Amino acid sequence: ISRDYNQVHINPLDTTLATFRIDYPFYKEGVGHAAVGALGQASLPYNYFERPQYRNFSFAEGFDVYTYRMENVPFYNLKRPYFHFMYLESGQKKFREENFSLTLGHNISPTTGFNVNYRSRGTKGLYEWSRTKNHNLSVAVSHTGKRYSVHAGFINNHIETRENGGVVGEWAIRDTTFEMPSGVPMKLTSSEATNTYRNNAFFVEQSYGIPLLPVTESDFSIANLPAVFIGHSFEYNSWSKVYKDVRGTYTDDRYERDADGNFVPQDGLEYYKNWFINPTQTRDSIYERVISNRVFIQAQPWDRNGVVGTVNGGVGLDLHTYSQFRLDSYLNGKYDKVDKSSYFVYGSVEGKIKKYVDWGADAKFYPSGYRGGDVSFGANLTLTGYIRKRPLILEGRFRMETRSPDYWQENLFSNHYVWLTPLRKENETRFEVAFRVPDYAFEVGVWQGIVTDKIYYGADSQITQDNGTVSVTSVYARKDFRIAGLHLDHKVLLQWSTNHSVIPVPLVSAFLSYYYEFWAVRDVLRVQFGVDGHFNTRYYAPGYNPALSEFFNQ
């Protein structure tokens, strides 16, 4: 469901055969992600243009492929009750990965239904101190009548991770043999570092349609009539993060070489350089809440599928609350709380020309106050042709944004990192062109992005802002071959960045999946077996800082 309008987005048909063999969600789309570790842990897409950009609580960006949000909560319209259960596990009990999902959907009437989706993914970890639990729940209710429609939902995301800080050196993986992976030395093992994330959200979006022509009994809906829709969107969304550790050290057996070329070990090394609040242990608690209200109008001049399908407009007000520990908390006995409000106007227009052309344009502007001056506008055009009833789809997209930094990028007080840093707005322009032939599993795409004043985390994990302009170009190709039951799937991504110290990307990334598929029992049990391969060229891959829950450039 759209945040701005009571407008649903149709998802591809969900089947157990589509990418069923891929149990890591960060490998299902594109060429995959650079992952911190196993199932349930943070990851970052190789494709720069697929990387999430959260306006609120950016600490959760690394878990984007797992979490439910208002825009990705599924709704179902069913003729029969639907139930789907899945449980997968792998590895020995001591290192086990588990993937559990449950979906229940039911329509009370042809226009009213509800569904529950629950996902639990996690690992006990091959490496020391890497256990992760990732739980995600969504409960949704929808009603789509002739005039009145409503979509509502509740979301709970709960993530617990043990943070080991990564290996003490490349030598521990590259040219050293350990009897078990659990023997590989990690930087934060003795520190017993953990992160706990909690998210609760509730939303309801509703609209009422006023037809401009009489509605007859034969009209199933007013989508084919001139009409005006008036609606309201409400969302309550709260996130919290608690990071804990104790002061510990690690030993690097190959810290440096002496004059004879022999390795010299170094003990007493610490992962964090600073302990601002407590010199022996850490408990950093951060809380953020956003209460959002939007009022919108959708004008339908002719019908929903007309040349000008809808002309939309709305106003919104977001109430932000941020809470963290500060030195003042010693005096007043409670965490510091900051309240901010941002208001904005937005609009869009979209239409179709039969089944051959889809087009749209949108804009959003914050006039003043918090995030004042932020602006976003974009356009899209889709051309569809047919050869022997097989579609050929050409898509183009454009987006230009000026956006303020996240609150935590300018204000942070924690045991290991402290900053009060005014930052400039980022400016980014993106172009995208894609060509798809679905019946032949063929797709190519090109992205071009130009970013000015990019905000990122430097090699010391400190917030940093570039003073120039960075250009990123990506070229993507996908082609799947099928020979009887044999599947040969290929995805390749090429990327270029004009400044790898600001936006590092691999030149080549690829994902290959070769497998054979057949019916073990006709129409009852289908089997797939094969091999998947991931590849990327050498580059300065991002590191991950547990205290900040952010990827940083190395």
Regions found by a protein language model. Name each.
Residues 1-200, 209-224, 386-392:
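Membrane-proximal, glycine/serine-rich, low-complexity loop/turn segments characteristic
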Residues 78-80, 189-252, 256-261, 265, ...:
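Exposed, low-structure sequence patches enriched in small/polar residues
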